[in-house]
Amino acid sequence: MAKQIQAIRGMNDILPTQSPLWQKLETVLRETVAAYGYSEIRTPIVESTDLFKRSIGEVTDIVEKEMYTFDDRNGDSLTLRPEGTASTVRAGNEHGLLYNQEQRLWYMGPMFRHERPQKGRYRQFNQFGVEVYGIGTADVDAEVLMLSARLWEKLGIKEHVTLELNTLGDPAERATYRSALIEFLEQFKEQLDEESQRRMYTNPLRVLDTKNPEVQALLVDAPELMDFLGEESRAHFSHLCELLDAVGIQYVINPRLVRGLDYYNRTVFEWVTSSLGSQGTVLAGGRYDGLVEQLGGKDTPAVGFAMGLERIVLLLETLELTSDIPSTVDVYVTAMGDTSKIEAIKIAQTLRSELPNLRVMSHCGGGNFKKQMKRADKSGAQIALVIGEDELANNQVAVKYLREKKEQELVARDGLATYIAKQI
């Protein structure tokens, strides 16, 4: 026997037993963004490496350690996209979507990061995100947060997530704070871990995001960015909080919250949960007003968020919120005898035509009545249709209930669709 080929580490299959939960999640996402008037955008999986170096930042973990990068046959450096925002901006600039106009966009698809696989975090993962361009006011920051809150409500996890908010100010304010933070960190340079020492001069705000408890203890007295904000940045953040209060969205201001990507300014946020252990963040985002211009477009305000779907699926499973996921089959059609088999196929096709939303599976491969009923039960169908010689002779179909304690019924063939529509 030939050696079996396995999936690449950290890149997982979604099996038929798992896909109904994924489909439910994707449906909720699509319905929610539609309710807010957002339009879908789809971008290539492979992009120029320079796109991510210029947007994410060359001294970030993603660019330094995690990107899947390779040279194509022309010698161009290409990268499997590690996130969706940069690609959305690139497409918006390239096709003139962002020039002097507002855009509300959403995307969903696979992303790739070469990091250590663990529960809820994989090397290929599915990401959903929304991006708004051309609006620089706090009301649209509030809108994307309201949209995300609506997602939790529709998924039944509203009580299990918490919104954390912070503001990073504008680039000038952040530069002043950066200098103050470096000065503070230099006092403890020898006590910082290797990663924090490396970040101290290249990206000091990321030191605030450390998971090392010893470094966290050193940061208790670190300066807070909020103290370095100008009047305009303070007013923006204050108005955002006011809007969230008005619509009843609870939040916690976390002055240590920074984002792992260089392009954020002003509003940053994360939805976190205590139900997933160390991988507590389930959605994150913020404002990135300089990125469109940085990637060759006109100066354009922007705000958005992204969420990893694997982590949401894990949360739904952890909270045991998967019991209402329906099976993929409503009706299973069986046949006894060659003539009946032909008629059974015709009946199944007629049902699919007359009831477009009905999910009908036909038995294939032969077998006696017991075997066919076993397959029908395994399919998850609510009803099995039995077509035998007697039923054919009387122009009827036997309806057998698989999930309810009801007696089997004989239904006229020409009234079958109407009958089933009332039962399912």
UniProtKB/Swiss-Prot annotation:
One of its GO terms (molecular function) is ATP binding. The keyword Protein biosynthesis applies. PROSITE patterns: AA_TRNA_LIGASE_II. It is found in: Cytoplasm. InterPro entries: aa-tRNA-synth_II (IPR006195), aa-tRNA-synth_II/BPL/LPL (IPR045864), Anticodon-bd (IPR004154), Anticodon-bd_dom_sf (IPR036621), His-tRNA-ligase (IPR015807), HisRS-like_core (IPR041715), HisRS/HisZ (IPR004516), HisRS_anticodon (IPR033656). It is an enzyme of class 6 (ligase). GO terms for biological process: histidyl-tRNA aminoacylation. It catalyses: tRNA(His) + L-histidine + ATP = L-histidyl-tRNA(His) + AMP + diphosphate + H(+). GO terms for cellular component: cytoplasm. Keywords: Aminoacyl-tRNA synthetase, ATP-binding, Cytoplasm, Ligase, Nucleotide-binding, Protein biosynthesis. Its EC number is 6.1.1.21. The keyword ATP-binding applies. Homodimer. HAMAP family: His_tRNA_synth. Belongs to the class-II aminoacyl-tRNA synthetase family. PANTHER family: HISTIDINE--TRNA LIGASE, MITOCHONDRIAL-RELATED, HISTIDYL-TRNA SYNTHETASE. This is Histidine--tRNA ligase. It comes from Shewanella woodyi (strain ATCC 51908 / MS32). The gene is hisS.
